[in-house]
Amino acid sequence: TPSPSLLPVQSQLKVYLNDELMGVLPVTKEQLGKKIRAQLPIDPLYITDFNRVRLEFVGHYRDVCENPASSTLWLDVGRESYLDLTYQSLKVNNDLSHFPVPFYDPRDNRPLKLPMIFPGSPAVTQQQAAAIVASWFGSKAGWRGQQFPVYFNELPDRNAIVFATNDKRPDFLRDHPPVNAPTIEMIDNPNDPYVKLLVIFGRDDKDLLLAAKGIAQGNILFRGSSVTVDGIKTLQPRQPYDAPNWVRTDRSVTFAELKTYEQQLQSSGLVPDAITVALNLPPDLYLLRANGIDMDLKYRYTMPPVKDSSRMDISLNDQFLQSFSLNSSQDVNKLILRLPVLQGLLDGKSEVTIPALRLGAVNQLRFDFQYMNPMPGGSIDNCITFQPVQNHVVIGDDSTIDFSKYYHFIALPDLRVFANAGFPYSRMADLSDTLVVVPKAPTQGQVATLLQALGGIGSQTGLAAINLQMTDDGNQIKNKDADLLLIGAIPSSLKDDTKINLLVEATKSWVKMPMRHYDLASIYPDDEARTPNTRTDITSSGPMAAVIGFQSPYNDQ
C-alpha cells in the first residue's frame, strides 16, 4: 500500500535477491493509497543455499524543496506477501564431511526437529548416549529451539538418528553387517532415498556411548560415509561456570568475545540501527546491593555537522540507563575523550555503571545513536536542498565489561533458573555434577522428555553433556553428592521423604492463589501480595505433567 502523497512513476519499489536487482515496481496514480497485489519473477540463477530478499523504497512527494524525512513518505508491504517456489529435491551423497548437515542446518531459522529411533525401549547406557547427542544438537540449535520425537522400531519421514547394536537393531537394519568398533554412518532411508539416517552403531551399548561422545567432540574430523571412534581422552577438566554461551566471570570480557557475527558492533545510515550485545549470565551471580558492573566503553561515530542534541542512548533489557552526547568539537568538560580517526569518525571513551539489580540470566545491552539531521528549507523560488549522507557508528571490540568481582549464590529450588538457564545442572557445562535417574523400561514419552531436557540444557550452555552420569537404579543415588534429575516416577529410595511426597501430592491436588496477581512478569509482588488468599482442591480424571524442584535429601547444598 503506497502513501497517497507520493508522486506517481517517480516513486517505486526495488526488489533485490542476494543484492541483485530482480525488478522494479513503479507506483502509478491509480495505486496511490490503495492495496496493491503485484507479481515479480525471480531468476533462479541467483538462488544459493542462503538467500536474502531486500525491498528498497524510492519515494518522492514533491519535485522541489522535498524533505527526505517527511512522514508522508511511506509504503507498507503486507504480511501476506509470499514467495512461490517450485523446486525438485536432489539425492544427496552419503558424505559426513558436511556434518551436521542435513540433520541440522545452521542457516535454517526454524526450530530443530530431529527424530531419534531405537530398536525398542532403550537401556540406561543407550539413553545416556542419546542424551549426549541430543544435548549436542541442542547446543547447535541454540535460540531456535529443538524437539526430539522418539520412535521404537519405526521409520519417520524425515532425517533422523538411529541407535543400534549388533544384537539389538531396528528391523530395517537387520541386513546391515555387524561392526567391530563404535561406528557413525550415514545411510539412505529404506523408504525414501531423499531422506538420510545417521546410524550410531556399536558392538554393545558402551560403544554407542563412545560414538555419541565422538559426535560431540570429534565431528570436525568426519568424512566419507562412515567413521569409527577409536578413543576419547580428556586433556583438561571443565571448570564451574565455563559454559561457552555464558559471559566469563573470572576476568573482564571484551566485546569482541561477545560478538555472534561480524559487523555486529557497527551500524550505518541516516539514523543508524541500534547495536545490540547479548549477555548470558550464570543465574546465581550474586548482585544484591552491589554498586554496579563496570563497563569500559570505547566507540567511534561520525561527527555531527553542528553542536546539537545528537546522542548515544544505552539501554539494558529495554530499560533506559544513560545517555551521552555526540560532540562536534573538542570539549574537555565532557565525559567523552575524542580522538580524530579515519574518515571523519570521532573516537569516544566512557565508563558506564550498569544498575546491577536489573540483570538476569539473559540480558540485552543496546546502543542507540540518535542523530539530529538538518533538513532543507526555503521556498519554491528560493529552495535550499542537499543530499543527506550516512552516519557511521562503531562500538570498539576492545570495550570491556567485568563480572569478576561478584560471588555465586542463589536460593534453590527455583524452577525459573532451570527453565531459563538449565541451572543448577548447567553449573558444570558438561553436566559432570549431574546424575540423571531414568526408568528401567522407559516409554517413548519418557525418553522424549529426557532428550528434550538435555537438549534444552545444551542450548543454554552451548556444550554437549558429555560427562553426565545416568542410572536406572534408584538405590544408587543414596548419599550422592550430585544434582539429581529424575525422569518419570520418583525412585523408591526417595518416597520415604515426607517433604517430597507432600510436594508431589500438593502439585497433583491443590493450588493456592495469592492476594494480588500481576499479569506482567516484570512486576515482582511483595510479601503481602504473595500471601495466599484461597486454597482450591481438585480431583481430576486426566493425567498431569509437571516439573517439580526440591532439595536433595543427601546434601544440604
Residue ranges and their predicted role:
Residues 1-557:
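Solvent-exposed alpha-helical segments and adjacent loops
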